[in-house]
Each structure stands twice: as structure tokens, then as C-alpha cells.
A protein has these predicted regions:
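Mg2+/Mn2+-dependent nuclease catalytic core
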Residues: 169-173, 472-489
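Phosphate-binding site recognition
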Residues: 1-425, 440
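Conserved catalytic cores of phosphodiester-cleaving nucleases, focusing on short active-site segments
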Residues: 433, 455-472, 486
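Active-site metal-binding core of divalent-cation-utilizing nuclease and nuclease-like domains
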Residues: 139-143, 436-462
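Structural motif
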Residues: 148, 464-466, 500
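Domain-level recognition of nuclease-like catalytic cores that cleave nucleotide substrates
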Residues: 491, 497-521
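Metal-dependent nuclease catalytic cores in nucleic-acid-processing enzymes
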Residues: 178-185, 338-346, 434-439, 483-502
């Protein structure tokens, strides 16, 4: 049985429960200190789903409620002396997804009624904006303290219909109405914190709150949610060591595998390395490294976005966009890239300060393989993603150094899906091979680039390395010649493994591989 280091808060987003029940908590309260020292009044934070936004919102609620006992030993305990108890209204809109007009209005009404009951009065108002205004004023008058408003997942009611104008407009009007009092309530408000995934600029939150601080892409707040590399290798080092022991790995090997699967998020130009907290905590709790975040569901709005912009699976990686692209409201976007970034499927890998452009890539192996598996049925037979089908068969034969058998399997597979290819041209051919070899990366290391050139694919096995070069209506001889002339094998000659080079040709008339050459060095 694995060594138990900590209790992990799997699925727990309530600060009070985590602290009282002794679950692992990575201290983020220094960011609250920062808010207070800078006298920030309105703060907006965008982060992907399941990335810790709700836990931070819950932490803020406990702080402003003066729950001093929950913060013992944390950074803010040394800063805060007064622990003033403010009225806090915490509105969680994550439950307002997939709703029509009447459902959304009822949801808002129920939230407000719950707070009205707590404050002991029944309103005569019907409109949500007037009820919110009365609620804040009533709390201020009763306590003599300014009010804190926390709106978690503010955009949840809108994301699913972002590409459906006839459905988006009425829902947006409802939410615009609900948020509209915030500006006029300024004299009664101590602090307002809003979280979401993207920025709907036409909502009153952004158009009227001139002093709203959007901290989403500020370097100093890059680790406000998620778990930084520093936090993992200091506060959580025993947890990583215990997971490694359970998996038969050293600490260094386990850290490298966690990094490969869950690290890689960057939310600003000089961002810290951030790990996905949902997957990381799940892995530590289960003693198993697996695609937990991606497996928890791909939002329908993301699939619709990819379809709307006809995104090809090969076009997602290493794309550049301007700084201004991140400030575009989703219903006004002309590209899928900003929403892919905001949703956590792409992240910042490089920033060019002269051109003010970001290079976006997949953050890690979990997201890349998950995205490819989601998109692959558009190009491949769905059954090809099963362990017993192409990828599994191909890798098994390579493991046994049966390269001929692997190529025969690949040829038969390509012939079987030829009718699924949309244009049956070189672009389709490239896309299929891109998917096949990248999906192999779910099981082992697949490399495309080297310092001296680019092979189509390099597959690593425990005892062998396989370098593939693929031609379209060319020849296998031409492919082998390119491997030799470009020196694609050179980086692997010192590994002490068997080295195979495979040159293959795809015949567009046969719609499969027509011939190949296999050579072992």
C-alpha cells in the first residue's frame, strides 16, 4: 500500500472544509495581501475550468467574513490584524449552464431569495438588478460594514451559446441586467471579485466598471490558481516522492512524468510554470498518472468553436496571435485560438516583446493527447483509438522489432479508412500520419524535431529507436535517402539502442502505403 503523506482535496472547493478537515492546502493568501495593500476594489480573473478559481473565491469569502481561525499559519495571518467581518455575497453561476431564458431567470431569483432569507427580509422587487441593489444596501445598513460581492463563473450561462446569436442575446441581456447595479453600488462595496473563463466585453461588468483590474495575464498573479513548479518541489516534495515510490520511480523520474503530463501552463509573458491542480491532486490521490482533467469532459462550446472555424488538427500547435486577440469578446472572435487559450487547451510558450505576439502551444501531454483523441474521429475510424486497434497493434509490433509487421498493419489500416478522408489529398495524408504518430505519444515518447533536421516521426522503445520518413506520391528510396542525407539518425547513435530507419511512400491512387524500405544500422 502506498505511503499516505496528505489528505488530498479531490473535488473540494470550499476553503473552510479543506482547513477544518486537514486536507492539503497550498497557501495562496499572499495574493489577498497584495489586493489589500494595493487597495484594489474590483478584480477579474480568467482561468480554465477546474483550475482553482472557485477555491480562491471561497478563500476570499472566508477572509472577508473575518474567519481568523481558518488562516492560522498562512501568509495572511501575519498581515491582517483587524479581521473585520464584512457581509459577503457569493454568487456561484457554475450551475447555470445549459439554461433557457426562464430557467436562468429562476436560477438568479433563487440565489437572491436565499440571501434575502439570510438577511431577514422579503423583497417586493421582481427584477434581479433591483433585488441585488436592495440586498447590498440592506446588508450595509444592518452591519455598518461595506459589502463584498463574489461572482464565480460569471460567464457560465453564456459560453454554451456563444456561437448561437439568437440564444446568446436574450441570455446576455439577463446577465447584463443582473450585473448592472455594481457600478452604482460602489459606495457600499468593499471588494468585488469576478471569475470566469473568458471576457464578454459587452456585459456591464466590463463596459461600466472603469476601475476593474483584469489580473488574468499579469506576471505577479500567474500562480494565483494552480500549483507552481516551486510549490510542487518544496511544499509537495514528499507527496511527489510517495507517488514515485508507489509507481516504482525515483523522485526525479516521478517529477519528470508529472511535468510531462500536467505542467506547462503559462498565463503571462514571464509566468511561472503552472501545473493543472485538478489532475495533479487526482494523480496523487489515486497513485496513478492519467488524463483526469481532459477526461472530465470537453465543453460543448469548445467543440462548436473548432467546428465554426474549421480548425485542422495540425493547425493548432505553435500558432501566433497578437496581444489584442486576448481582449476580444468570444462572440466577436475571428479565430479559435483565444478561446482555446482561455479554456486551457493552449498556453503561452513564447512572447515576442517587439512584435507584441504570443506563440501558443499545447501545455502538456495530457491536453495534447486528449485534444487529438477528441478530433481524431473526424479523420480516422473511431475504433482506431482503442488499445487493440491501430495504435496498440503498431506499437506492439515495434516493441517486438517487427517493423515489417507494423508497416503491413499500417497499410491495411490506411486502406480501410481511405473513404473517410475528406479531400484524399496530401493534406489529408499529412493529417492522418500526424494523428497516428502523435497518438502513439500517449504510450511512449514520439519526437518530430531535432537540432539538425526534422524527421516525420521518431518513436522510442526501450531497446530501439525508429525513424520514419514518409513521402506522398514519391518513393521509399527517396525517403531513405532523405534520412541519410539529413542525418536524422545521428542524435540517437550514442544511446546504445538498435536503430531502424523506415522510408515509406503513400500512393494517392491506391490510397494507402504502396511500398516501404526498412534498414537497421
Amino acid at each position: 500500500m502506498a505511503k499516505i503523506v496528505n489528505k488530498y482535496p479531490v473535488g473540494i472547493q470550499t476553503f473552510e472544509k479543506i482547513r477544518k478537515k486537514g486536507y492539503l492546502y497550498i497557501d495562496k493568501t499572499q495574493y489577498i495581501v497584495d489586493f489589500r495593500e494595493k487597495q484594489m476594489s474590483y478584480v477579474f480573473l480568467s482561468r480554465p475550468r477546474r483550475f482553482g478559481k472557485s477555491l480562491f473565491a471561497s478563500t476570499l469569502q472566508a477572509y472577508f467574513e473575518g474567519r481568523k481561525e481558518l488562516f492560522e499559519g498562512l501568509a495572511i495571518a501575519d498581515y491582517e490584524k483587524d479581521w473585520v467581518k464584512h457581509p459577503v455575497f457569493h454568487f456561484d453561476l457554475s450551475g447555470a449552464k445549459h439554461m433557457g431564458i426562464e430557467q436562468l431567470e429562476r436560477y438568479l431569483a433563487d440565489m437572491l431569495e436565499e440571501q434575502e432569507t439570510i438577511w431577514g427580509y422579503k423583497t417586493h422587487q421582481i427584477d434581479a438588478n433591483l433585488r441585488l441593489k436592495d440586498l447590498v444596501k440592506r446588508a450595509y445598513e444592518q452591519t455598518g460594514e461595506k459589502v463584498v460581492v463574489i461572482i464565480d463563473e460569471y460567464d457560465a450561462p453564456l459560453l454554451d451559446v456563444v456561437h448561437e446569436k439568437e440564444n446568446l442575446l436574450p441570455l446576455r441581456r439577463i446577465m447584463q441586467n443582473f450585473y448592472s447595479p455594481l457600478k452604482m453600488l460602489d459606495p457600499y462595496l468593499e471588494f468585488t471579485f469576478i471569475t470566469g473563463i473568458t471576457k464578454f466585453s459587452q456585459l456591464s461588468i466590463f463596459s461600466e466598471l472603469n476601475n476593474l483590474d483584469n489580473i488574468s495575464m499579469f506576471d505577479q498573479y500567474s500562480a494565483i490558481c494552480g500549483i507552481s513548479k516551486k510549490e510542487l518541489t518544496t511544499q509537495m516534495k514528499p507527496d511527489v516522492a510517495a507517488l514515485g515510490e508507489a509507481l516504482g520511480m525515483t523522485y526525479e523520474e516521478c517529477l519528470a512524468e508529472l511535468t510531462r503530463y500536467y505542467d506547462g501552463y503559462h498565463f503571462s509573458e514571464k509566468s511561472e510554470d503552472i501545473f493543472n491542480p485538478f489532475s495533479l491532486v487526482k494523480a496523487l490521490n489515486a497513485d496513478k498518472i492519467a488524463p483526469y482533467w481532459f477526461g472530465s469532459g470537453t465543453p460543448s462550446y469548445l467543440i462548436k468553436t473548432l467546428q465554426k472555424y474549421h480548425v485542422n488538427v495540425m493547425d493548432i500547435e505553435k500558432k501566433s496571435c497578437d496581444v489584442d486577440d486576448f481582449d476580444v469578446s468570444p462572440e466577436m472572435m475571428t479565430s479559435a485560438l483565444p478561446l482555446l487559450y482561455q479554456s486551457g487547451y493552449l498556453t503561452i510558450k513564447k512572447y515576442n516583446p517587439m512584435l507584441h505576439r504570443y506563440t501558443l502551444e499545447y501545455p502538456n501531454r495530457e491536453v495534447k493527447i486528449g485534444m487529438l483523441k477528441s478530433l481524431a474521429p473526424n479523420y480516422l475510424s473511431p475504433i482506431s483509438l482503442d488499445n487493440n486497434s491501430l495504435v496498440g497493434d503498431f506499437l506492439e509490433k515495434l516493441y517486438d522489432a517487427d517493423v515489417e509487421g507494423a508497416m503491413v498493419r499500417l497499410k491495411a489500416y490506411l486502406a480501410s479508412i481511405s473513404n473517410r478522408l475528406s479531400n484524399k489529398n496530401e493534406r489529408d495524408f499529412q493529417t492522418v500520419f500526424y494523428l497516428i504518430f502523435n497518438l502513439m505519444g500517449a504510450y511512449m515518447k514520439v519526437e518530430e524535431d531535432s537540432a539538425i533536421g526534422r524527421a516525420d516521426a521518431v518513436v522510442y522503445m526501450p531497446d530501439a529507436v525508429f525513424v520514419f520518413e514518409l513521402k506522398y506520391d514519391g518513393s521509399a528510396e527517396e525517403a531513405i535517402r532523405q534520412i541519410d542525407e539529413k542525418g536524422y539518425l545521428i542524435p540517437y547513435t550514442a544511446d546504445g539502442k538498435r536503430l531502424f530507419k523506415i522510408g515509406a511512400n503513400y500512393d494517392s491512387t491506391q490510397r494507402t502505403i504502396s511500398n516501404w524500405i526498412i534498414k537497421e544500422e
